[in-house]
């Protein structure tokens, strides 16, 4: 799991973003383009729920491009 510098602008560190993105509790495709954009919710090592946008390439490579503390409107998506 790679983390783009743009994903860090909301104060989430790269390790936390990668951990949350690698083990999502919610995942949804945002479009059918290539690379596919996926919206994910996951927890970092501090147990913060993060919202993430991850590019998923056909090769299997994944790149986090957005990471921030999850906004309340996404809590209903949790299982």
Language-model-detected regions and their locations in the chain:
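Ribonuclease/tRNase effector modules and their secretory precursors
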Residues: 1-79
